[in-house]
Every structure is written in C-alpha cells, then in structure tokens.
C-alpha cells in the first residue's frame, strides 16, 4: 500500500510504502505449515471462532490500524491545522476504508482512470 501526500498547491510532498493487505495474508499462508489462504472479507467480530475468522480479523482490523496510524502521523507532520482529503483507491479500498472515519472518497479504479485520461491525451 502506498500513501502519496500532495499539498494544497497540488505539489507532491512525498509518500509512505507499507506491505499490502494481500501480501500480509499471503505471507502467513506461505510461511506457516497449516494456515490457509484467505478470502478477504469483513470480519463479524474481533475474536474469531475459527482459524479463518481469526486470520480475517487480524488482517482487516490490523490493516485498518496500520492505515489509521500512518494517516494520523502524516496529518500531524504535514497538515497540523489544515483540512485534509483522504482518497482510498485500489482493489481493497472499499473493504478497508468503508468503515474508516476520515476517508473522504473511495475510488477503487482511480489509478486506471488516470492512466486512461493520460493515454487519451497522446
């Protein structure tokens, strides 16, 4: 997952790179003897009643925690008293960001649409 930070003047400030949600769950599957490959979906509760439920809980709730912490630090360091628009994009944007306060827009295909627009300019 990447976090790209853009100023109010539309200037790229920098970014953050962290492991993606699928990379996290694939790592568990590939590096442990008995944990299954996950189908990612919203957990019903934090404490799972099965291995799959426990893994889904750890993946989704843990990932939201990672995102919240990084966003909080970006806001504190770069935009201490300014309003910030957070846009979630990518394949798991809806699953992860739909239950996160502070996310202004969820647009899973924004990058592809941007590439289409740039392609049409040429």
Label the predicted regions.
Residues 1-2, 20-23, 94:
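Short, catalytically relevant binding-site loops at active-site mouths
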Residues 14-18:
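A mobile, often basic/glycine-rich helix-loop segment
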Residues 24-122:
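ATP-binding/phosphotransfer module of carbohydrate and carboxylate kinases, centering on a glycine-rich
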Residues 1-12, 28, 115:
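Gly/Thr-rich phosphate-binding beta-strand-loop-beta motif of the actin/hexokinase/Hsp70
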